């Protein structure tokens, strides 16, 4: 089933398909997706700190399945959506804003979907997600143009270290934080566990929130990540009840 959906998405992005054939494939595969006001997005992962590729499917055959399962569940909870793998750690997302005329509501829904996906990728796979968004909504017959656009935009990811959302290469691109950057979280936890508290510079994290002007939801995610690290370190360093009884 997943293989057939991946193939359908590849065809939609690279060749013209008659509407009758498209509808037939969607009916057979049980795909619920409006065919207008579609947002096209590529999902990739930041390479690991040691230089290894972020693509883990070669090590875990269930990686693709897990990623797509989570992404599609989030898309369906927020409305119509479809996701597939293009191979080499590149995933394509389609979600429809059909019937919605408010740009503010379209942007809010898009941001909510990406934030949830980013959060799940970090929590379940320890992967830093990046997103390349099409510059406009399209109907299903014009996805090829959008795919060329986001594929070109993906080259810009080379210049970004943290989770980011890229929309336009013509304008200055900004990194949109999706929670605490993974490397910051790891160094924070390591310093706490080693007892080198002087290396924990909370001011740098708060300065990052201020200078990037992250919204309330993102700030909440960052603070929740900090609390999570502190909680894990407390559990790691606190003596067990048995040890306390001995003392």
Please state what every model-predicted region is:
Residues 10-39:
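Juxtacatalytic helix/coil linker segments
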Residues 29-37, 48-63, 73-238, 242-247:
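Cytosolic nucleotide-utilizing catalytic cores of signal-transduction proteins
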């Amino acid at each position: 089933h997943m293989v057939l959906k991946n193939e359908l998405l590849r065809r939609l992005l690279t060749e013209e398909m008659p509407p009758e054939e498209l509808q037939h494939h969607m009916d057979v595969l049980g795909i619920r997706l409006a065919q207008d006001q579609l947002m096209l997005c590529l999902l990739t992962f930041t390479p690991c700190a040691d230089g290894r590729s972020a693509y883990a499917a070669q090590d875990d055959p269930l990686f693709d399945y897990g990623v797509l399962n989570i992404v599609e569940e989030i898309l369906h909870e927020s409305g119509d959506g479809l996701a597939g793998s293009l191979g080499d750690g590149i995933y394509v997302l389609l979600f429809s804003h059909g019937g919605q005329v408010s740009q503010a509501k379209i942007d809010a829904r898009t941001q909510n979907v990406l934030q949830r996906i980013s959060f799940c990728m970090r929590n379940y796979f320890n992967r830093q997600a990046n997103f390349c968004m099409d510059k406009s909504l399209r109907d299903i017959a014009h996805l090829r143009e959008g795919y060329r656009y986001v594929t070109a935009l993906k080259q810009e990811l080379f210049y970004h270290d943290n989770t980011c959302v890229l929309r336009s290469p013509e304008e200055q691109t900004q990194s949109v934080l999706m929670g605490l950057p993974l490397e910051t979280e790891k160094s924070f936890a390591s310093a706490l566990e080693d007892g080198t508290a002087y290396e924990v510079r909370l001011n740098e994290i708060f300065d990052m929130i201020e200078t990037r002007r992250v919204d309330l939801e993102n700030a909440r995610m960052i603070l929740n990540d900090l609390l999570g690290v502190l909680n894990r370190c407390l559990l790691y360093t606190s003596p067990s009840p048995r040890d306390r009884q001995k003392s």
